[in-house]
Amino acid sequence: MAIVDDAEMRLTESEAVSSSDDRKIVADTPDFIDESSLVIRTTTGVRISALPAEQSLVDSDGSNSEVTLPAKDEVISDGFTCVNKEIVESDSFREQNLEIGEPDLDVENRKEAMIIDSIENSVVEIVSSASGDDCNVKVEVVEPELLVENLVVAKEEEEMIVDSIEDSVVEIVSTASGCDCNVKVEVVDPELCVDNLVVVKEEEMIADSIAESVVETVSRGLDYECVDVKVKEEPDLGTKLEEDSVFPNVLEKKDEVIKVLEDQPSEINKKLEQENDDLFSSGDSDGTSAKRRKMEMESYAPVGVESCILAPTPLRVVKPEKLDTPEVIDLESEKSYTHVKMEPVEEIKVEAVKMSSQVEDVKFSREQKSVYVKKEPVGARKVKVEDGDFPVEKDWYLVGRSLVTATSTSKGRKLEDNEIVNFTFSSVAKWKVPNIVRFSTKRCGEIGRLPMEWSNWAVSLLRSGKVKMLGRCVAAPPFLTMMQEIMLYVSFYIHSSIFTDVSKSTWRIGSSPNLESTLHPLLQLFKHLTIKPYQKAEFTPEELNSRKRSLNLEDDYDERAALLAIAKRRKGCQQSLEQNKDEEEAPESYMNRVVGAADSYNLEEMEAPSTLTCNLRPYQKQALYWMSESEKGIDVEKAAETLHPCWEAYRICDERAPSIYLNIFSGEATIQFPTATQMARGGILADAMGLGKTVMTIALILARPGRGNPENEDVLVADVNADKRNRKEIHMALTTVKAKGGTLIICPMALLSQWKDELETHSKPDTVSVLVYYGGDRTHDAKAIASHDVVLTTYGVLTSAYKQDMANSIFHRIDWYRIVLDEAHTIKSWKTQAAKATFELSSHCRWCLTGTPLQNKLEDLYSLLCFLHVEPWCNWAWWSKLIQKPYENGDPRGLKLIKAILRPLMLRRTKETRDKEGSLILELPPTDVQVIECEQSEAERDFYTALFKRSKVQFDQFVAQGKVLHNYANILELLLRLRQCCNHPFLVMSRADSQQYADLDSLARRFLDNNPDSVSQNAPSRAYIEEVIQDLRDGNSKECPICLESADDPVLTPCAHRMCRECLLTSWRSPSCGLCPICRTILKRTELISCPTDSIFRVDVVKNWKESSKVSELLKCLEKIKKSGSGEKSIVFSQWTSFLDLLEIPLRRRGFEFLRFDGKLAQKGREKVLKEFNETKQKTILLMSLKAGGVGLNLTAASSVFLMDPWWNPAVEEQAIMRIHRIGQKRTVFVRRFIVKDTVEERMQQVQARKQRMIAGALTDEEVRSARLEELKMLFR
């Protein structure tokens, strides 16, 4: 018998024999077990199959051999076995000196480079993981040294690499030899040598184990199990016969095949039989030794296979194919000492062997190592194992079963058929110790271990205690030796605790779990058990995280410029701000670059509802159409029967839970049906300020009125065993009954009256009922609130209610049809209570209205997506991994992905957006922006210079000590005083802690020509409270923690917390006492301290009034407007209410009629001020704080804007200007910014320009700190 190559296989049998130039012979494939092909798999993973051939032997010269083929079931030698006229390889000739290296790697079909790379990558992985650096390694496995050449690592990392490789070699050697070994690793440049591989008698086994490990690496690198590896036999296996050996080992290397015929005895057969008889007749005179040897040999191998000798020659896999499921096939004969394992496989050929009639040197091998053979195939035994599977346990669910080929790590032990095996693993994960799963039996102890491709993922599951493995032996050798294959049938069970109640899922909106914990290896279990989802998710994390995945987004110039700016900044190529003035951008263009502006001219237009009293512009009709379509979704019945797009459905073996649903992003599993009802409907209307977002929303409310449905938003699920018809009923029955509300609009307090007025103005009478839920007379009846079509409230009221009752607050007990967040950037920080309160609201549709969805950093958008319930992006782990971090690192995928997410969710138009005809969508009067540079008087300059020098000395000390950022608050305090000094020195002289600035008193007297009043000291017990009071006196009033607005009638608690008196008393259940909402301290009403309201200034500012340079320039502008007689109205913005106090003095003296609007005004006071300013002609000036007037207000009655002091964030100033330059404005808007020359204000403009060039969120924490330090140094130049 022989195996031929492809060319010969295409010939006929006779032609093949006649054309066999290299003296190859041909034999037939026998008929055996369904006439399937046979293959032999060695312990190294190499599989060899016989091919069809003639039934006659051909000698080396091409003539017919005198010896005919062996009959059926005849076995030839313990090296090769001929069964059914097929040549197979026995395990007794394991490759004991397998050389895997570039010279000895004989690979066909052009796969040599792949295999060499696979071997080298295996070693590179060990070296790289230990050193943390990349390395270039050339591997050659020889006996007895392991050479690793061209090791490119840093010298200081060498010791760690040596230890890692030494541990790896120790493990291989110890596993192969069964005993501990002492390995010495010597690093020689450029080679890494491993010496002293245990004792000499174990060298062959160790070399074989190392070689097998490399073969396993090669096998894993290909798509099929068999590999193109040349297997060389031991050059000389012959050793002297030891007296106590059962089998003499005098077999020498042969180049011939010796075949013995059972039916026709020959000289060869006679010689073989004589040799066998001599073997068993030798020993003591009484024959006991021979008898004992024969009994031991018979017990060593089961009866049924007859052995002969076949000397091996090199075998090579030439044409590997994808293999079928392994099957073990019986060999039946009367007697045998050799057993082989055979498996069906596609056509594979090996090199031919030669025939010889010489038998003088043919003898039995001492090291005969059998491979297991059973009388029934695996399929039959698998059925028996399934029938006798493990008993059902209450809380454990059977997922599936699989055949696993394990490896033995023990000698001389025996496994019974269907014997139960137990699995163990290390309870502590260590980077030096791989994940190993060992198996044992109660009878024999440890037997072996699972392959690493199973252990790597199984250990993490087993450690959780929620997954367990139970196994039985299917096929194993009768007596085990090292590194033999054992076939196990393993069952996998999962505990019921692994299932998540979807309504209580930890994958919450706005949650921030550890990303690694969300990547659950349960998916790996399904993969190895070949369990595929019968209902797949719409998209997977792999698709999102793949570098090959294309989002089909066009790269625009702005995006590339932004990424280039990041790269330059990371490389230290940042140029000075003065050299880059031409790169300065407006906040509007900055916003457009990051989030983009929609091509809205392709949108259809929708006519306004008849109940709307105003006319909509074309772009507003487009917005109405887009919002209406966004609110349309699948109906309730379909949603209750539709699987959520982030979940997949799998079928398992356990009848109690035939289906498991797995969240592919969080890894959570459930046996309940996750419905699609949570999917949000709505989006972000991000039109630039002044385009009429309020009117568009009112048109939507009138066009699509509705009431909430309890089942629409709650994350509830139906029983998995319910059919589709009952799923909706069960789903609704599980839902908590809530009142059905209309539209909830949440806005800042300053916009409450404006929303109410707009709703009443733009809708016909009795069309909608509006409730303003604000103030002390609020009702707590959910049904009464829900009865109104529109409910208006503030972020402060919502947050206060949420803090008290969390998800059971008055707003959370209503299922709203629609929720609208006006000025939605208010919740840009997703960790705040205000943001969390909005996340927990229940509604059918959700809308965010904001002209600045991105203010400071990319993370601002994340909070909006959390409110909209856009999965999986409402989870911080995935947002951070796939968007935030790539964006920070300059990876364009981060920016592309956020654009892809926002494209269907956001509609954004700017004042520069054009329609189909190329015209601007909104024609507004132009703006005239000027910067007025003020020159300080001599007294002001001296005062400022002294203050600056003192501040700079303190700042330089912080820099020298390296504690700048540790004293960041103190430095901001220094900058605050410098900025206030630019407005008016009185603001600095209002400080009560005069000791720090005592040396400035002489300069103050020069400016005021009067000494400041002294400040009395309070009792020490009230010192800390007085510090808090002083913040309020200085104009640095903090917002009330309950309503999130500037404190109105502020009070101090004994625990030194400041808030509105009304907000605090309203939060108490009793009128006389309650808890502090901050620290939960018990408070009494009599203990509350009213904050001082007397003048904050240390001097009598009215009596000692003197105009500063900035105030003088402002008065000149106002006088000019007054003299013109045009009736123009002006708004003066400042961020300090104390400066507004000072401005009142010269305005009164010069006869100007003015009003004031700041955070201290209550809601009714604000309504009165705005109404009077818009309707009366006498009040031409409005003093307004930048914070209170920067959002949402419609101030088109004014046409002149005065910005008295620069703000850190230019977007805040832009918002204030847009209150005037918007729809309804009919005059040119004049904007005047006041800057004092050669002061910190001038440098603040440069800092503003720097911030505008920085892409939000594009810096690491370290770079943020470095940027802050550079900005501070710029300000103190």
Curated annotation (Swiss-Prot):
What is the first-listed, main subcellular location in coarse terms?
nucleus
Location(s) in or outside the cell: Nucleus
Q: What residues bind ATP, as annotated?
A: 687-694
User: One GO molecular-function annotation for this sequence?
Assistant: helicase activity
Q: Cite the Helicase ATP-binding domain residue spans from the record.
A: 674-871
Keywords on record:
ATP-binding, Chromatin regulator, DNA damage, DNA repair, Helicase, Hydrolase, Metal-binding, Nucleotide-binding, Nucleus, Zinc, Zinc-finger
Q: Where are the zinc fingers (RING-type)?
A: 1040-1080
What residues form the membrane-spanning segments?
none
One GO cellular component, as annotated: nucleus
Outline the segment boundaries, as ranges, of region: Disordered.
271-293
Entry EC no(s): 3.6.4.-
Q: Does the keyword ATP-binding apply?
A: yes
The residues covered by the Helicase C-terminal domain are 1113-1277
Which residue numbers does the motif DEAH box cover?
Answer: 822-825
Q: Give the family from UniProt.
A: Belongs to the SNF2/RAD54 helicase family. RAD16 subfamily.
PANTHER family on file:
DNA REPAIR PROTEIN RAD5, TRANSCRIPTION TERMINATION FACTOR 2-RELATED
This protein is called what? DNA repair protein RAD5B
- Native source species: Arabidopsis thaliana (Mouse-ear cress)
